[in-house]
Amino acid sequence: MEFTDQALAHCPDIDEKRVGICGGSYGGFMCNWMIGHTDRYGAAVSQRSISNYATKCLYTDIGYYANRLQMEAYPWEDFHKVWSMSPLSGAVNAKTPTLFLQSDEDYRCWMGDAIQMFSAVKRQGTDAKLVLFHGENHELSRSGKPENRMTRLKELEEWFEKYLKKN
């Protein structure tokens, strides 16, 4: 978020009300985190993301040790620490319209995390949309089926146009 502050300070031509964020994998995690901690962005697109470290540590192809390395704790050792580092914990504050793009065969960032974050944001009354890609995995944007890659880009473009385009 500090980067956005610096960019806006150095580039006065940027309309700060029409800045969007987008990220996939760790970038999706960061996107989820930011929408729960600031309302500065006009729209967000979260792709193949992580939202809940308490459950992620039990079902990722990275391995059972991943949470321990990232957070120095498993949920059963220090639930508060793990939960406080999970984007889902901040979803109650989400005000940014967010599109969630997720593959149903992604075993790194499972579909459940996208559904949890989408559901939590939607329940806050914030506009959100979830698009699931059947038969795709973590590599959708790079090596997915051409029709799904095109759909992904179309969804992303339409979301940003809806919320960021000048009338």
Model segments located where?
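Active-site-proximal cap/loop segments of hydrolase catalytic domains
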Residues: 1-167
